[in-house]
Amino acid sequence: MDTSTTYDALVIGSGIGGMEAAIKLGDMGHRVLVVEKEPSIGGKMILLSKVFPTLDCASCISTPKMAATAHHPNVTVLTQSLVESVRGDAERGFQVTVRRAARYVDEALCTGCRLCETACTVAVPDQFNGEMVSRRAAYIPFPQAIPQKALVERPGTSPCTFGCPAGIKAHGYVSLVRSGKHEEAFGLVAETTPLVGTLGRACYAPCETACTRGSLEGPVSIRRLKRFIADTHYALPEPPTTERPAPNGKRVAVVGSGPAGLTAAWQLARNGYGVRIIESAPAAGGAPRLSIPSYRLPAEVVERDLVNVTDLGVEIVTGTRVDDLEELRNQGFDAVVVATGTPRPARLHVAGEESLSGVHAALDFLRDIRLGQPQDLTGKVVVVIGGGNVAIDAARSARRLGAAAVHMVCLERRAGMPAFGWEVDEALSEGVLLHDGWGIAGFRGTGSVEAVELKRCTSVVDDAGRFRPSYDEAHRDGLDCDVAIVAVGMGADTAAFPLLAPAGTRVLQTDPTTLQTAIPWVFAAGDAVTGPTTIAQAVGHGRRAAHMVDRWLRGLELAGFDEPLPVVDKAEVLARQGTHSRREPFDAAVRLAEAPKDFAELEPALSETEARQASGRCLDCGVCSECHQCLAACPADAIDLGMRPQRLEVEVSAVVVSTGYRLFPADLKPQYGWGRFKNVITGTQMERLLAPTRPYNTVLRPGDGRVPERIAYVMCTGSRDQTVGNPLCSKFCCMYSLKQNQLIMGALPLADVTVHYIDIRAAGKGYDEFFEQARAMGTTFVKGRVAGITEKEDGNLVLRYEDIDGGGVIAEAEYDLVVLAVGVQPNPEAAHPFAHGALTLDEHGYVAEVDEDLNPGATSIPGVFVAGAASGARDIPESILHSGAAVAQAAAQLERRRVPG
C-alpha cells in the first residue's frame, strides 16, 4: 500500500459516486486517497440484484468499477477507515486525520482462502445479506469484495473474558464447546494455565458475574463448562499432550507449587526453558491440593492437572524448603520465581489461643485432612472462627468428620461476610450454625479448650475503610466447645526471604507491573505478593511473572503483558441482539445434606447435551470469541489479534464528500412489524433474495423457508411521511420495486404480486415503459396507504389498507410475504469531519450545494465538493453524472493550486 502522507485529493466514501470520482481524478494524473468505512469498497450498488430499467447485472457493472478503483496507479484505498477531521482551507490545503480500524488480518499475507471463516466458531448476522442468514466473525464480506481479504469482527472484549483475572479466554472456550470442539477448548484454556480441572471446580467464576446473560435469565454456566472440558479431556484413553518445545538453554527455578508457581512454570516451559519447581510441602499443588476440601475439588483432579506440567518436562521436587536464593543461582538457574503463597495462618492474639490444646489453625486442619490425617471429631462440638472461604471450608469439613455441632463465629453480619453468599447458604444447609457480628474475647479451658468467649462487634472497619474492629465490651456471650478452629486470615512467609520483604512488610515486595524484586534475577508472584486472593488471580499473576522473566532473559523491555481491547458495553450487546429467546440456566443440583457423611464431590458434571445447551446461551458479546481457531487454520499466518487502530495524518488539496445516503430504518414504522414479523422484509433484503449470490437457492420467506405465493409491496415506507420527519420522495423506490416485481415474476412465475402505492413516479428515460411492462406482466397496483400489518399464527401477514380507486374503502388482504419499499435519508456522517457547522447542510440534512444548477458539487467550504447521493436522493446514473460535476470542480481547484493566480 502507498504510505504517502500527501495527496492531491481525498474522496470520502467509495460507493458508485466515490469510485467514479476517484477514477476520473486518477485518470487526470492526480494522486487520490479514498477512505471507506466499510471493509470493502463498492457501496450499496454491489448489494443489488440488477439495475433498472435495463435489468443488467449490478455486480457485472460495479465489480469492474471496484477493480479499476483499487488497482488504479494513482488511487490509494483505505478500507475500514474513518475521516475524523478535515482542517485547513483551499489556499493552504487541508490536513486530514484518518482513523483506520484494526482488521486483525495482515492484508499483505492474507490470500483470501476463507479457511479462517470455516474454522470460526461464532456466527453473527450477515449484513451483506440483510441479516437473513449468518456469517462468521472471521469473514470476507461478500464474494466480490475488494480487497478480497479476511477480517475479524472485534468491537471489544467480551465481559466474561475481560473479567477473568487469570486471562483465560472464557468466551473462546464457551464457543468451542458450542461447536463440539472439546479438545480445542481444553487447549485454549491450557494456553493460559495447566490447572484446567482445578479451575473448572474451585474457581469463584468472576466471568459469570460479568456475563451479559446474567441480566436476563441468569449467566452462562462458564465455570461448569470448563470442568466439562477438563473431564472430557482426562477421560480419553490417551489424552493429547502439549508438545515440548526445543530447549533454549536457560533454566528457571520456581519456588512454590501453587496456582501461581505452576502457571509460571507451565508458561516458561512452553517457551523452551528448563524449569524446576521446588515445594516445601510433601505434595505439590499448593492450596488446591492441601487446603480446598475434596467435596469441592478432589485430589485426583489436582494431580491430573499436575501431569500436564510434568508432561511438558517440568521437574517437581517436594519436601524441600528454599531459604537461600543465591544457592539456586549457584546451581545454574538463570532466574527464580518465588510463588510461595500465604502459608502462615493469622492469629487472634487472645488468651488461651497458644496455651490450650484443641485450638487449631484452619490451614493446618484442612491440610491434615488432605494428607490423609484428619482429626476424629465424632460427637464433638466445634467452633470455627472467621467468615471467609477458608472458614466455610473448615466448618463444612468438620461436619463431615462427625462433629455433633459446628458453630461459625464471624465479625461481620451475614451480608458482609467475605465468603460468597452461596457458600454460606450451603454451609447452613449442612447444619452449620452461624453467629454473625461477634468477636473473640478469648478461649477458656483447663489444658484444653472448653469454651470460646465472645464480645459483640459493632463495626468491622473504621471511617477510612480500614480493617479496625470495634466492640461493645459490655455485651458478652460464650460457646462451649471441644475444638476451636481459627480461620481469620493468612500471610506470606516473609522470614524466608528477608531481602524480598524488608522489616515491617507482610508480603514480598516487587514492581507491581513487572513483578521483579530488588534482586534483578528474582521475580515473585501470587499471594506471596498480593496477599490472599483467588486461584484465578494467582494464575494471572503467575502468567505475568513468566512473561516478564522471559523478556528479562531475552534482554527485552519488561512490558507488553495482556493488553486486551476495552470491554464491550452490555447495553449495546443487548440492543444488538434485538430479541432474546428465553433460555434458563442449569440448576447446579448440588448434593447437600443436613449431616454430610463423606467428602464426595457435591456438584454434578454436565452431560454433553447440557454442555451444548449451556454454551448455546452465550450472546457472543465481543463477536470474536478469541477461540484462536482462525490462528490455527490460517496457512499464511495472517491473523494478528494484537492489531490496534491507527491514526494517519495526511495533507490534500481538495476533498470530495461522497458518503451516500442512509436507508430508512423500517422499525421506525412499528405498525408494519419489521423486526417483529419475520416475513416482513425491506426492499434491500428482497434485492439479496433475488441476487445471483443470494442467501437461499430461490426466493424464500425468511420465517419458515417456504416459497411465497402472495407477495405485497408497501411503497413510500419512510418517504413522503411527515410522521418520521422525511417529507421528501426518495426518487428511486418506485423503480427498484418495479424491477423487483419483474424479477419475482421470473423467479416465481406463479406468484401474485400486489403493490400498495401512493403515486408511481417513473421520471426517466425508459422508466414509464418499465412501469407499464411490470403491469403487463401481472403486477396488481392498489392506490392507497397501508395502515398496519398483523401476523397470523402460520406466519402469514394481514394488511389493512385503503383502496382509493375502489371507492376509498378500508380493506384487508392476506399475504405470505410483505416487502417494505424503504426510502432514503441523508447520511449524518457527511458533515462530521468538518468543524462544527462549517459544512452547510440543507433543511433536510443533505450536504448543501452552493447552486445545484449553476455550480453543482460546490459546497459552503471552498475546496470541498460533494458527489452523488450525499447531496440528495439520486439513482445510479444520476450519481455518476453528479460525481462528474464534482470531479470537474475538484480538478479546477487542483489546477488553481498548481498554477497560483
Give the location of each predicted region.
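Phosphate-coordination loops involved in phosphoryl transfer and adenosine-cofactor binding
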Residues: 6-8, 80, 107, 248-251, ...
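Beta1-alpha1 glycine-rich phosphate/pyrophosphate-binding loop at the start
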Residues: 7-71, 134-140, 159, 165-179, ...
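Non-heme iron-sulfur electron-transfer modules
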Residues: 38-64, 78-109, 121-159, 168-194, ...
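A conserved FAD-binding loop/helix module that cradles the flavin
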Residues: 528-556, 656, 724-736, 867-897
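Short cysteine clusters
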Residues: 110-116, 120, 160, 164-167, ...
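A short, basic/flexible loop-to-alpha-helix module at the beginning of a structural domain
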Residues: 1-7, 148-152, 233-252, 364-379, ...
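FAD-site-proximal beta/loop scaffold in flavoenzymes
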Residues: 122, 126-148, 355-380, 462-532, ...
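A Rossmann-like FAD-binding core segment of flavoenzymes
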Residues: 64-106, 298-351, 360-378, 400-505, ...
